[in-house]
């Protein structure tokens, strides 16, 4: 089993990440839709510009996340890094996120101007396929 291939598959198939930010020494976790760019090793997500997440990330861009398993599996990816506002417009990531989470299009259509795209550049991640199948991969 090639765990790098499994990483790519999980990032392609799973629709959401549980994203953890920090504020005043406390973690805050939210579920967000995401898109993973295999060439740039970047995770993209969007949030509303008036969301507390924006304030938290401006004060401390350090994050951690885990993909949210689906289809009765426990396989997932977990990673940490820094989330920064993306130079890409929301329109640049919409199609890729909608391919995984079709209802995201409704949000973009209704309030796209209020969404800020963020990116997380990965340097390493842990891939967990099962209790005995896991590995740390470095990009």
Please give the residue ranges for each predicted region.
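Short beta-strand segments
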Residues: 14-49, 57, 63-67, 76-79
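Charged, gly/pro-rich active-site loop segments
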Residues: 77-139
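Short Pro/Gly-enriched beta-strand edge/turn motifs at strand-loop
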Residues: 13-18, 99-103
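A short, aromatic/hydrophobic, helix- or strand-capping loop or linear motif
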Residues: 21-23, 68-70, 106-113
